[in-house]
Structures are given as structure tokens and as C-alpha cells.
């Protein structure tokens, strides 16, 4: 059972997140030959104030 976990900064629309879920699901199915029912894709949205890169939060960087 393939499990894919994705972390993204909060702020994207539900339709964008659903499109990502579907695209990743399809990529796993097509590349690994996994049955649809066995594929799990989880997106975790992280507050930009709680995610840092290069010593600055994403919020500070304007993302």
C-alpha cells in the first residue's frame, strides 16, 4: 500500500489541493502499478508562521 505524505504551506484553495491529490494518486498508480484502492495520499497544511527555511518563516518571506 503506497502512502504519500505532502506538507504544504497553508493558503491554497481546496480545488488546488484536490488537484494535487489526484495528480499524485495518478502518478503513483501509473509508475508503480498500484491498485487505486491501495493508494493513500495525505496533504498536511502548515501555518506559514510555523515553517522556516533559511532562518526565516515562510510568512516572513512573503509566502
Spell out what each predicted region is.
Residues 1-63:
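A domain-level signal for the structural core that forms small-molecule/cofactor-binding pockets
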Amino acid at each position: 500500500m503506497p502512502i504519500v505524505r505532502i506538507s504544504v504551506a497553508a493558503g491554497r484553495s481546496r480545488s488546488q489541493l484536490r488537484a494535487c491529490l489526484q495528480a499524485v494518486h495518478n502518478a503513483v498508480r501509473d509508475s508503480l502499478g498500484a491498485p487505486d484502492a491501495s493508494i493513500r495520499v495525505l496533504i498536511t497544511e502548515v501555518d506559514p508562521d510555523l515553517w522556516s527555511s533559511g532562518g526565516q518563516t515562510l510568512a516572513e518571506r512573503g509566502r
